[in-house]
A protein has these predicted regions:
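Active-site-proximal segments of metal-dependent phosphoesterases and phosphodiesterases across multiple
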Residues: 83-87, 121-153, 185
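Anionic-ligand binding region
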Residues: 140-177
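Core catalytic region of metal-dependent phosphoesterases/phosphodiesterases
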Residues: 12-103, 109
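Active-site-proximal beta-strand elements of phosphoester/diester hydrolases
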Residues: 12-20, 123-130, 176-180
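N-terminal amphipathic/basic-hydrophobic helices that include classical n-h-c signal peptides
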Residues: 1-10
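Acidic, His/Gly-rich catalytic cores of divalent-metal-dependent hydrolytic chemistry
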Residues: 169-245
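Active-site metal-binding loops of divalent metal-dependent hydrolases
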Residues: 17-19, 41-43, 68-71, 129, ...
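Short acidic-hydrophobic surface loop/beta-edge motif
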Residues: 113-121, 169-171
Length: 245
């Protein structure tokens, strides 16, 4: 938890990332009253309900930035996933593009690579991966790369996603916040992750959701049973897929 010294009253802002077409997790979000919701990218791929997720985010999110999977669906390019996810990404990309409407694709294409804004006196920089590589830069919490990344921006809080693991880390005058993944967390627990900024304080949160519902929908996706098993395993274990995918 990070508390900004001398912070005045701030809006309540819910921050989500890496939904990956998991509508059941999104609809189970426990926050019902907030001033704004921000989405840090990767609305689509892997999961069974991309169209509904895109429309939800389009309707609810005040600020959304583009993730590597949004970019892949929007422009028919490689999302450049890590080896354990390459096959799953390729298989579900085809499904996602078949299911998404022209309106969905137009929305994904138009998403910015990053967004800067100020809430009262606090400066925010929102980007899916990292400032120097907005779509693909992979920076875990303890990466030395963050020392350089924070020098490239002028912000009190740098909000990122991409790694699917939540963390809060301060470097100099900048605090880096990763809310984790709402739709495909890699925490070792089957709990959806997000963050809340309220009254000058940011905190990481997680919650259970009807995973069985998402698993049943994955079974209906036109991909191989092995790939279905791998996707469900990731959700159930909060870990990398098995079976060499």
């Amino acid at each position: 938890m990070f508390v900004r010294p001398g912070a005045e009253h701030f809006m309540k802002i819910v921050i989500i990332s890496d939904i990956h077409s998991n509508l059941a997790a999104l609809e189970a979000l426990p926050e019902r009253e907030f001033d704004q919701l921000w989405c840090i990218g990767d609305l689509v791929d892997y999961g069974p309900r991309p169209h509904e997720v895109v429309q939800w985010v389009k309707r609810v999110s005040a600020v959304t930035v583009r993730g590597n999977h949004d970019n892949a669906v929007g422009f028919s390019v490689d999302p450049q996933c890590s080896p354990p996810f390459k096959r799953l990404a390729a298989e579900t990309l085809r499904f996602t593009q078949d299911v998404c409407t022209e309106d969905d694709v137009t929305f994904l294409r138009a998403l910015p690579g990053h967004h800067e804004l100020k809430v009262n006196t606090t400066r925010f920089y929102l980007v899916h991966a990292c400032p120097t590589d907005p779509l693909f830069g992979y920076c875990p919490e303890q990466s030395d790369r963050w020392d350089e990344e924070v020098l490239r921006i002028n912000a009190d809080l740098l909000i990122v996603g991409h790694t699917h693991t939540p963390f809060i880390r301060s470097i100099g005058k900048t605090t880096i916040v990763n809310p984790g993944s709402l739709g495909q967390p890699k925490t070792g627990r089957p709990l959806a992750c997000y963050a809340v900024w309220e009254d000058g304080t940011i905190s990481l949160k997680e919650y259970p959701y009807p995973l069985k519902e998402t698993a049943e929908q994955i079974r209906l996706m036109p991909i191989s049973p092995d790939d279905q098993d791998a996707l469900i395993s990731v959700l159930e274990t909060g870990a990398l897929p098995t079976g060499g995918h």
